[in-house]
């Protein structure tokens, strides 16, 4: 259910600045193919890993591959800080820009403050207050330590679902690519509607009625 790299090529225009690829349900996108498209067209690759904290692509954790990777810390995700999210990058220039962007566009350059005084700062561009509080951070860090166990539990549940659904021809369970490990934020089944007498909404309501 992730984006097709070939479809990305069809959408590129001279105005394109970046590619934002979503790791839907926790399954990493094809980072090799999409990364090559970004590199060939001088574009920034932003990986939306809101669903994919802890997922891996070719034995590398998501967050260590794209130019920037975003994660959600909403209460329904793998770990939470109450609300909000975070962005990671290995690019020092992007990191500097992100720090300004989260703090009202303010630059607190260390060397400049040494020369002109600790009160010195410049508001260099439009920015916002996206700073995570220490209380929120502590909550997230404490849960981050539990992430491996949380991921393992999700994978055990996926195995049970796959076994339970294996002989039901009316649906197709989600697949995991051979070179990736999904974080299984969601377990999305595909209904084979041609073999069913009910549509998706009716099945959804019936499942909800059974809790």
Model-identified regions with their sequence ranges:
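Conserved active-site segment immediately N-terminal to the catalytic lysine
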Residues: 47-80, 110, 119-124
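Short, Asp-centered acidic motifs that coordinate Mg2+ and/or phosphate
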Residues: 17-18, 44, 68
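PLP-dependent aminotransferase class I/II
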Residues: 3-6, 10, 18-22, 27, ...
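Hydrophobic residues in beta-strands of the RecA-like P-loop NTPase core, especially within AAA+ ATPase
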Residues: 22, 46-47
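Active-site PLP attachment segment
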Residues: 64-108, 134
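Short, hinge-like loop/turn segments at secondary-structure boundaries
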Residues: 9-11, 37, 61-65
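Short, flexible helix/strand-to-coil boundary loops that buttress conserved ligand/catalytic motifs
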Residues: 12-13, 50, 57, 66, ...
């Amino acid at each position: 259910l992730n984006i097709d790299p070939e479809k990305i090529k069809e959408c590129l225009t001279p105005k394109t600045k970046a590619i934002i690829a979503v790791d839907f349900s926790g399954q990493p996108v094809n980072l090799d193919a999409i990364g090559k498209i970004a590199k060939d067209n001088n574009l920034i690759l932003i990986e939306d890993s809101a669903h994919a904290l802890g997922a891996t692509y070719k034995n590398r954790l998501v967050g260590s591959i794209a130019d920037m990777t975003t994660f959600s810390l909403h209460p329904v995700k793998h770990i939470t800080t109450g609300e909000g999210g975070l962005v990671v990058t290995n690019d020092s220039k992007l990191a500097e820009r992100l720090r300004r962007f989260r703090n009202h566009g303010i630059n607190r350059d260390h060397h400049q403050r040494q020369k002109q005084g600790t009160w010195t700062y410049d508001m260099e561009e439009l920015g916002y207050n996206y700073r995570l509080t220490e209380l929120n951070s502590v909550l997230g860090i404490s849960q981050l330590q539990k992430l491996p166990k949380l991921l393992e539990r999700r994978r055990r549940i996926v195995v049970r679902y796959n076994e339970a659904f294996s002989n039901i021809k009316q649906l197709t369970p989600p697949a995991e690519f051979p070179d990736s490990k999904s974080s299984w934020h969601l377990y999305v089944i595909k209904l084979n509607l041609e073999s069913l007498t009910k549509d998706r909404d009716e099945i959804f309501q019936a499942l909800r009625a059974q809790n």
